[in-house]
Amino acid sequence: MEDYKQTLLLLISTPLYAVLIGLEMIMSSIHHKHLYTVKDTFTNVYLTSLNFGLELLIRTFCLGFLAYFFQFHFISIENPYLYWATLLILQDIAFYFEHRVDHYCRFFWAVHVTHHSSEKYNLTTGFRSSVFQPLYRFVYFIPLAIFGFKPLDIMFMYSATQIYGILIHTQYIKKLGFLEYFMATPSHHRVHHASNTIFLDKNMGMVFIIWDKIFGTFASEDDLKNEEIRFGLTKNIERPNHLVDIVFHEWVNIANDMKMNIPFTTKLKYLFMPPGWSHDGSRKTSKQLREELKGEL
């Protein structure tokens, strides 16, 4: 049954991606938007292949890990509609907190930064996967197993929501009316990928935006005044399509920071504090940058 469901997802998503990416490429060419380059697109596909390969390698371990916690579950939802709807909601909450940690802890940001490293923004940006994220993502699904959701169903739901998460990486869909109030839309996700100061570390949800509104990480595309939205990092890497640089550049930066002649506890802060933290104030976190911007207005 599991193979059937996973195969069905691939059979649906693969041609869907191909058609929509092809259409976006054509529209980009017609409108001279230059949303795509060959190198950037190839890099995105290559990175998602590495991510997918690692997921396959450790899939059995992840399922066994979650199965261990599933044996302690204390809730059973019998109604299948309620079961899948609840799993969707709880899985998206789990993703929200994983994503938030990825942005606010430099150790995990060093993994996740790969996804934000392109200055281009198109449907294939959703493929620009954080290569090593499968090594720890499943830990966030422990509560779902304890709440009575089967490990295979948890993994299936994550794969299904990933399809939606990829499709919102586009500049061609502007606003989606009332869906903007509770869904993570293309507009909301453009904010997430923006490097403009007011948008840093915002809009973490993959399917629903309500978690961002509840936990204070929401920003609207309309909040940006008198400047164009910029994609990428606050300091973009010199070789954005060089595999080693994309995957490891932040680890190199962390290593250089930890080589400084500072106390060991301070060294650890360079590993676990938010990106941009520095012991001497020479760099700033996203929160500090926003506060500084507010002071200038």
What spans do the regions from the language model cover?
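Membrane-embedded catalytic scaffold of the fatty acid hydroxylase/desaturase
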Residues: 49-61, 73, 77-229
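Hydrophobic transmembrane alpha-helical segments in integral membrane proteins
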Residues: 1-17
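Cytosolic-facing loops and C-terminal tails of multi-pass membrane proteins
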Residues: 225-297
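Helix-boundary and loop/linker segments of multi-pass membrane transporters
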Residues: 2-6, 34-40, 73-80, 114-115, ...
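Hydrophobic membrane-embedded segments
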Residues: 65-73
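Membrane-interface helix-loop junction between the first two transmembrane segments
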Residues: 22-42
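Central hydrophobic cores of alpha-helical transmembrane segments in multi-pass inner-membrane proteins
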Residues: 16-28, 63, 88-94
